[in-house]
Amino acid sequence: MSYRQNDVLIPESSYIRFNDVQLKKYYFNDVLVWQRQQKVYPGIPVAKTQNLGYSPYFTVTNLGYHIKVDAFGGTERGWGRVMLGPFSSIGYSKLFFANLHAYITNAFSKIAVSLGDINGNWVQRLIYHDTGETLGGYDVTYGSGDLFTINSANGNYYLILEVDSGATSRGLNAVIQMNGCYLI
């Protein structure tokens, strides 16, 4: 949320100084009116895509403001990951998503959202679900109220969205869709 003071607009990516101290949050009458945040997505590009299963069964659709990563489990396994970045998390301790929707309709399938490197090696798992032999049934949406504490010791990360749909011949999916990711 931006904040306007003395006709000056202070964006979320800036700082407010009070008594020579840089604030990450600013309250007025005990109400939060400004909070420093960094937009990760939209903004950072798709740095790398890895198709790890049967090629036609993995798709990525990136509109710049909405990304969809989809694995289809047909006669072969659909599996792949997308690395968005790089971005620096130094100075931030939490991460939240603006409407990240993850769902699985297939058995032997997984979804994962992680922080890691350009090669897909994760450093910190944020979201993970494995259906095992159970047929799907996973459907969760994460919003701005779902905060994830991050380890910013490294500071230079990629956001990894990974989907894996088992070869069950059922033609079912594992999907991650996201509209935004922010550091606070």
Give short role names for the model-derived ranges:
Residues 87-98, 154-158:
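Extended extracellular/luminal ectodomain segments enriched in beta-structured repeat modules
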Residues 122-153:
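Extracellular carbohydrate recognition and processing domains
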Residues 109-120:
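Short, surface-exposed beta-strand/strand-loop-strand elements in extracellular ectodomains
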Residues 161-170:
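Short beta-strand-plus-loop segments that form exposed binding edges in beta-rich domains
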Residues 66-91, 141-148, 173-178:
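Short beta-strands within extracellular/lumenal beta-sheet-rich domains
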Residues 1-37:
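Intrinsically disordered, compositionally biased repeat/linker segments
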Residues 106-111, 172-176:
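Short coil-to-beta strand junction motifs in C2/discoidin
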Residues 34-59, 63:
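Extracellular carbohydrate-recognition regions
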